[in-house]
Amino acid sequence: MGNKYVIVLTACINPGKMIHTSLTDVDIRRRQYEDALEFYLLQTDYPIVFVENSGTDISGDFRKFVDCGRLEFVTFQGNEEFDRKKGKGYGEALILEYALEHSLFVHQCDFLVKITGRLKLLNVNSMIGFHRYILPHCDIQSEMDRRERYSDSRMLITGKGFLQY
């Protein structure tokens, strides 16, 4: 493996009536996604895949990054395709599955840095560097809470093989 990393920003600009969604204003969500995407484009050198599951295309303002091969948009209509009682986590898993199947950048990488697309991970370069030099053989890097027995999926680093299960 060549230790190639790609940042995968997961997005649902129009959540519709998804349960447990506190921010439903599509315009605000769109601005937050655009701001975060701009942050990663300016603060990192990694290729970025923006995977959006409500069929909303925001690629127009980022054309120069697409044209130079730094950014890939994968947009599909997936938010209506599952039982909403399964929740946002299930929808996010479907986004990653779709990216595995349809993204050229993901196909070419060794590791995915999955970040919830509205968030700006200020230490993203340090996190990737830590993984690259300290944990390159680790299947997954994520914030884990042993007391609660859950993993925070807002950010994780993993090889593609882990996600294929």
Predicted regions and their residues:
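ER/Golgi luminal nucleotide-sugar-dependent glycosyltransferases, focusing on the catalytic module
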Residues: 1-165
